[in-house]
């Protein structure tokens, strides 16, 4: 099921507007933050000028370029892929015209493509195709009408040009914040971890962050639980960001872009064996649906974090 981010955001906004304790401020930019032992404040710039807001905790969910993360001095560890990804959206019906399912992955020795249907404002909906680009090409070349048509036609030849209703080019990273907690500042979503989009794990991982963190914040704020519980949020969600989201999304990309014939044959054989074995198929689905990562997070304890910390100290001594 595809539920675009703008739709989930709209649903959340509608729900928040019904909460008397929530104030929603659009067109505001975070400039700086400061925290004491008892509170944290954030300085923002909005339509009426600069203002300050204070509270018990601050959640930085302000995206991959998070100001909250940077102002908190938290490193964003990982790497950036050399190639950019381009998304081309078209009303062309790949199911009716070519028999494609709603989510398809194409692994060609020369390149790869994702093709999936989104409902948009439909029916009938739209189809999005995603491709890697040549790092040596300029943005103008890639995004030109000629460049866009050449790319989509190379995968899906058609006698007529495709109608392209949206095109987007973006840089892709694999990064995880060094910590999801710094005192009264917490990170969630893309501010805490980013990855390539193959498999749809970024937004879904952020939703899992929100569920985990909100549960713990409620217990700290309303049930007088020790705020050490928030250290567990950091440990649980950072563990799965590294062990599941990063590992799986990188593996997804490498599987699609493999060009060596023997590697490609092994990959396909492995997928066939998985599809033919009910237990392997079940484990594959648990992992790709991120159910397994949620269960892994629930099993992580602060004691495990202490053992890891001690292990790092021993290694460095």
Residue ranges: model-predicted function:
Residues 1-317:
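Core Rossmann-like FAD-binding/catalytic domain of the broad FAD-dependent monooxygenase superfamily
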